Amino acid sequence: MITGSLVALVTPMYPNGDIHWEDLDKLVDFHIENGTHGIVAVGTTGESATLDPEEHIRTIGHIIKRVNGRIPVIAGTGGNSTREAIELTTEAHKLGADACLLVVPYYNKPTQEGLYQHFKAIAEAVPGMSQILYNVPGRTACDMLNETVVRLADIPNIVGIKDATGNIPRGAELIEALDGRLAVYSGDDATAADLMLAGAKGNVSVTANVAPKAMAELCEAAIAGNEDETRRLNELLMPLNRKLFLEANPIPVKWALYRMGMIGEGIRLPLTPLSEKFHGEVEDALKASGVL
């Protein structure tokens, strides 16, 4: 089972939007050196929506090669087309990804039965790939209910779910209903500590991009049930957990990494660089959390 701090890695870019492969290598090494437990490649934070299929697969492969087995790599291979998701998942499996992250289909708003059949079809098409589901209704306009997740838990290679609802009572109910059949991961930095203390096995984190060591330590403490240490670290990171979402993710976190000297300012349209009026707030959060 993959556990701990799973960074939702940004995809660094040049000002013209081309991928900056050298900066990507630097980020991978930065995370391994600072204790990150796993990397999520080409998810929402990695700008999956604006990478073409060839770039998508190339980026996953590049990260897997750079990691070289040191920590798990989870490949973002979801989509709102089941056929496309199967194709991406198949390619990620060939490249050696340890698992894939499959977002609930967005925009076309399937029913709960449609969601079940979508994830079932991917699992059956790529039976050797461990699959982590991803429910983020704030982005997809489609909410996968706990009952559907419990039903999907019967499929052998579906091994987890990233819960980005931010609803702790609901997440705790899901953990109880699954009874260990799937690992539940937080997908919301601001509430991750509480969900892990309730039994979640890790956090797919935006904040970990800029504070990998502290986030890894928080996840370790929370999973171990050390509430005092979890609360201390959560308080330290809370300014980042809040300010990295002043504009749509990954806009603020890419600017934060730029401010840290880790990457350039490149981001792809329709996303634009962080509004200047928010620069001070993000910089203050970096300082408050001990990053700068």
Curated annotation (Swiss-Prot):
CDD domains given for it? DHDPS (cd00950)
Show the disulfide pairing: none
Name the major location: cytoplasm
Entry-linked Pfam families = DHDPS
What keywords were assigned to this record? Amino-acid biosynthesis, Cytoplasm, Diaminopimelate biosynthesis, Lyase, Lysine biosynthesis, Schiff base
* Function comment: Catalyzes the condensation of (S)-aspartate-beta-semialdehyde [(S)-ASA] and pyruvate to 4-hydroxy-tetrahydrodipicolinate (HTPA).
Instruction: List residues traversing the bilayer.
Output: none
The active site lies at: Y134, K162
Under which pathway is this protein filed?
Amino-acid biosynthesis; L-lysine biosynthesis via DAP pathway; (S)-tetrahydrodipicolinate from L-aspartate: step 3/4
One of the record's GO molecular function terms: 4-hydroxy-tetrahydrodipicolinate synthase activity
Q: Does the keyword Membrane apply?
A: no
Positions with a binding annotation for pyruvate: T45, V204
Record-listed E.C. numbers: 4.3.3.7
Supply the InterPro entries for this chain.
Answer: Aldolase_TIM, DapA, DapA-like, Schiff_base-form_aldolases_AS, Schiff_base-form_aldolases_CS
Q: List locations, semicolon-separated.
A: Cytoplasm
Know the name of this protein?
4-hydroxy-tetrahydrodipicolinate synthase
Site (Part of a proton relay during catalysis) location in chain: T44, Y107
Subunit info?
A: Homotetramer; dimer of dimers.
Source organism (scientific name): Marinobacter nauticus (strain ATCC 700491 / DSM 11845 / VT8)
Question: Which reactions appear under catalytic activity for this entry?
Answer: L-aspartate 4-semialdehyde + pyruvate = (2S,4S)-4-hydroxy-2,3,4,5-tetrahydrodipicolinate + H2O + H(+)
Could you tell me the Gene Ontology terms of the biological process aspect for this record?
diaminopimelate biosynthetic process; lysine biosynthetic process via diaminopimelate
Q: What is a single cellular component term in the Gene Ontology annotation?
A: cytosol
First-level EC class: lyase
HAMAP family according to UniProt: DapA
